[in-house]
Amino acid sequence: NCYHTYYPFFPGLSERNWTDEWLDAKNLEESEPKNFGDKEYTLYEAKQKQRQMELAMRAQREKVRLLQKGKADPDEILLHKAKYQGQLNEYSRFCRKMKLTEERERIYLDMKGRVATNSKRQNALFPREMIENASKDVAQYKRYKEVLGDYIGSLVNFGQMKYNDSEKWKIIS
């Protein structure tokens, strides 16, 4: 994660690349915090957050691939793809706001191609809260499906009911 470059320096022979004034200005610029959401980040903290986001997206890509290999419920796969798409969008917003270069090659290390949902229509099937809480909501859906059977409907219907139809949700929960 270090972005330093080292060169041999021989006192009396070598010339410095940067003046003390330039280095002081650069240090001041890099230590200036920027806001994203409800948190402030210095350049170093922003780069750490960027790496954390990339790691989370690689994990989500792997989860989608494993669900596909395991022939999971298509709605569950779609929900996790939508979560991945949301992570990508958040990553782009974060990098723009922090003036960082997006390093998507760090996300695509698995060389497995496209994982995100294909359209906004697919993303719109699930409420935003459900996309954020994908794993918990899928587990909850499976428990309800075990008890209530087909009455609970599909994962898409479950999400719509839980987050958008409070009357029906009160009845079943």
Model-predicted regions and their roles:
Residues 1-173:
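Activation/maturation switch segments at domain boundaries
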